[in-house]
Amino acid sequence: MVKLKSIVIENIKNVQYGVIDFQNKSDFINVTGIYGQNGSGKTAVVDVFEVLAALMRGGSIPPHKKGIFNAIDQVGENNITLELEVPGRYNIWYKVKLAASEPTGSQDIIVIKEEIGYRPLESGARYRYLMRYEYEGSNFDSVKPQHTGTLKSQRSIMGKDAISVLTKTITDDNRSFLFSKELHSFITASEKQELSTLIEIYGVMEEFCQNLRIFNQELSSMTGGEVTPVTINYHNRESHLSFQGIIPMSLQNGGFSIPEELYPVYDGTITYLNEIVPMIIPDLTLEMETGETEIHSDGEKFKKVNFISNRAGKRFSLKHESEGIRKIISMLGFLVEVYNKENIIAIIDELDAGVFEYLLGELIEIFSESAKGQLIFTSHNLRVLEKLPSYKVVFSTTYEIVV
C-alpha cells in the first residue's frame, strides 16, 4: 500500500509557492478540502496531479495542460515535489523541474531536472537519492537545438550516447526521462543486484499511478451537457472483463449506440449504481432501455440504448435530470472506491459545483468519519467547511510571498 504524504508546487499557473501535507501527526488524512477565492490556485493542484500522472506513466504532458506553466525567463523554474509513503517501510520523493516557453496553447515544455529518492522509516535514517537527470541542451529559441543531458545514479545504467539519444526523444515528446519506457528497459535488462531498490521504488510509484483517480474541470463541465462521464471500476468474474476509468453516457435524442462487447460494462454499471444511488438520493433509480441491434459496414455490432431516471415510478430521460444529481452519478464510482479502499487516492475539482449544499455536507461528513482512502477536493461552499475539522482544510490565498 502507498499513501500520498505531501505535494509542493512552485510557479505553476498563478501559484508562486504552495505546499499541502496529507498527514496529521502520524495519521494520513482521509479527506482534504481545498478552499480559496477565485484565482487563488485551487485548480492548480488538480492540474499538477494530472501532469504528474502523465509523466510517471511514461506519457507526454497532456496537450490540454499546456499553457499552465510559467515562461522560465519570467518567474523562475516550474517545480513540483511529490512525497509518498509506504507505511512502516519508507518515504519516497519525486522532484521535477520544467522549463516552458510563452504560455500559449502550443506551449513548448521541457523536463529539465528530475530526482527520485527515498528514506527508510528508521530512527536517524536520511534521504538517499537513487537517480538524477538534468537537461543540458539548448533553449527554445535556438536555431539548431542541441539536446544533451546527464544521468546520475548509484550504479551506471546508460552510456553517454544512449543518454543523448533518449534526451532528444523525451524532449521532443514532452516526456519524463526517469519514467520513460526506454530507461526502464535499460534498468530491467541490466540485471544488477544493486538496482533492486530502484526497481522496487519504481514499483511503488507505478502502484500510486494505478490508484490515482482524477475528476477534473473538463469532466465536471460535461455533466451539464449531452454526455455525462461516469466513473467506474468494473469487473466481471465470469468473462474476466475489467474496466477502470470513465465511460460516456450519451444523452442525445434518439439513443446512444454502444459496441456490443461493451454492453455488459454499461449494464453492470447501471446495476452497480442502483445499489448506491437510492441511499444518497431516495426514490431515484437508473434504467437503461435497450433498443435494436445495429450492424455497421465493417460488421461490428452496436446496441442502441437510452438512459432513464426513475423517480418513485415517474420515468423520464436522464438528460432532464438536475445537473447536481448527474454530477453525483458521474463522480460516484471514484467516491465509492475511495470510501472502501485504503489504497485509492481520488482528486475531484469543484466537488460542490451544482450539488445541493445539504446533501454535499452530509456526504463529506460521512467520508470524513469513515473513508479508508484519501479524498482531495476543491470547493467554494462553506457548508462543507463546517463539516470538516481544521486539519482537513487547506486554504489557498492570493497574497504574494515577500522574501
Where are these regions (language model features)?
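Hydrophobic, Leu/Ile/Phe/Ala-enriched alpha-helical segments that form helix-helix packing faces
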Residues: 53-56, 84, 269-285, 367
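Electropositive, glycine-dotted interaction segments
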Residues: 101-281
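Switch/communication elements of ASCE P-loop NTPase nucleotide-binding domains
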Residues: 1-64, 269, 299-403
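A structural detector for beta-sheet-dominated domains
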Residues: 10, 21-23, 83-87, 99, ...
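Long, charged, glycine-rich C-terminal linkers/tails
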Residues: 63-68, 284-302
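Short beta-strand micro-motifs enriched in acidic
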Residues: 95-109, 291-296, 399
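Conserved P-loop NTP-binding catalytic core
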Residues: 46-104
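Broad, structure-driven detector of short, well-ordered beta-strand segments within folded domains
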Residues: 90-102, 125-133, 286-290
